[in-house]
């Protein structure tokens, strides 16, 4: 099956998918998240990634630079391969067009050699995982890696600030699982299996959960998890719905709230930026993408970045646990490092920062492990 433009009804992460007797899944690889969307599928003999660029005239024309596009595609996908490899790679299109670019053909040869070397060393092994991370939304595992994805790795103004989180995680040294609100209802102790929970997206969407945050069982489970030492990272408008005087239902964990008009007459004083472990590699400028306006910090929070009195990054403590708020985080090497630090801080694991670590955030270190550390 080619997992591409149309695959409704063939949800590859549902348990029923493994019963249909499919031999293999092939899909277009636009970035790390799309690679994991393919490589994490279970119950097939092999998975294959169709790398970019396709041999089509939009790239293979006079003055075009298919080699550059191929390099960006490979470097982006490679970090995800090191976490969970596909079994085969390939390219597609009109071969006649590719033959007109000998540099491109030479580069593809080098990619194939590198892939074989990586595959021989990592297939069947367990990658080093510094912490266990859960992405909480309405779909859970059914849309693993495909949430915030409309078309393979295509930019959309409305969601690139959130898709960057999933992209960063696709090649990061974490054991990543996707869970739903129903999973928590059915298994109240489920969160004990994780170190950090993320909720990412806009309000009143399946990404963040909408009215699920009115459910006492959900609120109790998440608050108990954090209070006992877990971490919660909210991106965009996390845990949000207007209810009982709050918009962010976990404002007490995140330390921030969104002004929706009900607290305009409440003075807000917490606007000072502070240095922090999370931003040590970030420099003065952080790319929050579209970001968010009208987010203000509660007195207990520590603001790390604000723009025009709109909080973009803040941290807070809740019992023995910690909360982190991020307004948005498009994928980049720098932002991938920021998210890595944010997860470690949320998990109270700053001391593990230098395990398999590069001080240059443009370089990522991948290691193999037989157990989670």
Question: For each predicted feature, which ranges?
Answer:
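A glycine-rich, often tryptophan-bearing local segment used as a flexible ligand/cofactor-contacting loop or short
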Residues: 209-284, 289-291, 305
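Short, hydrophobic/aromatic-rich segments at coil-to-beta transitions
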Residues: 298-304
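Helical hinge/lid and interdomain linker segments adjacent to catalytic or ligand-binding clefts
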Residues: 154-249
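Conserved small/polar residues in nucleotide/adenosyl-binding loops
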Residues: 371-373
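Conserved beta-strand segments of alpha/beta enzyme cores
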Residues: 175-177, 302, 322
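Extracellular/periplasmic catalytic domains that process cell-envelope and extracellular macromolecules
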Residues: 126-129, 190-192, 227, 317-318
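Hydrophobic targeting/anchoring helices
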Residues: 1-159, 244, 262-273, 277-291, ...
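Active-site proximal loops enriched in glycine and acidic residues that flank catalytic Cys/His/Asp
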Residues: 26-29, 51-53, 93, 137, ...
């Amino acid at each position: 099956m080619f997992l591409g433009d149309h695959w409704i009804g063939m949800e590859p992460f549902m348990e029923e998918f493994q019963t249909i007797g499919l031999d293999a899944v092939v899909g277009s690889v636009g970035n790390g998240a799309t690679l994991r969307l393919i490589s994490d599928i279970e119950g097939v003999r092999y998975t294959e990634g169709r790398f970019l660029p396709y041999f089509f005239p939009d790239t293979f024309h006079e003055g075009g630079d298919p080699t550059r596009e191929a390099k960006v595609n490979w470097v982006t996908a490679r970090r995800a391969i090191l976490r969970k490899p596909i079994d085969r790679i390939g390219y597609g299109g009109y071969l006649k067009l590719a033959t007109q670019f000998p540099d491109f053909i030479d580069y593809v040869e080098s990619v194939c050699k590198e892939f074989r070397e990586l595959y021989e060393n990592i297939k069947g092994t367990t990658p080093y995982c510094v912490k266990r991370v859960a992405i909480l939304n309405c779909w859970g595992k059914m849309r693993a890696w495909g949430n915030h994805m409309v078309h393979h790795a295509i930019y959309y103004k409305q969601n690139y600030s959130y898709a960057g989180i999933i992209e960063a995680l696709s090649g990061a040294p974490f054991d990543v699982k996707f869970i739903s609100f129903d999973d928590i209802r059915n298994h109240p102790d489920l969160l004990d299996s994780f170190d950090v929970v993320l909720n990412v997206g806009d309000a009143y969407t399946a990404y963040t959960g909408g009215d699920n945050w009115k459910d006492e069982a959900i609120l109790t489970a998440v608050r108990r998890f954090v209070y006992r030492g877990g971490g919660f990272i909210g991106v965009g408008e996390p845990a949000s719905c207007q209810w009982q005087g709050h918009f962010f239902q976990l404002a007490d964990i995140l330390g921030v709230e969104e002004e929706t008009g009900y607290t305009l007459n409440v003075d807000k004083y917490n606007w000072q930026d502070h240095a922090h472990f999370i931003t040590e590699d970030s420099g003065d400028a952080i790319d929050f993408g579209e970001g968010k306006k009208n987010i203000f910090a509660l007195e207990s929070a520590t603001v790390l970045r604000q723009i025009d009195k709109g909080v973009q990054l803040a941290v807070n403590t809740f019992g023995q646990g910690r909360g982190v708020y991020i307004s948005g985080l498009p994928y980049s090497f720098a932002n991938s490092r920021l998210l890595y630090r944010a997860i470690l801080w949320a998990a109270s694991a700053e001391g593990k920062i230098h395990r398999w670590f590069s001080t240059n955030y443009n370089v990522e270190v991948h290691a193999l492990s037989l157990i989670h550390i």
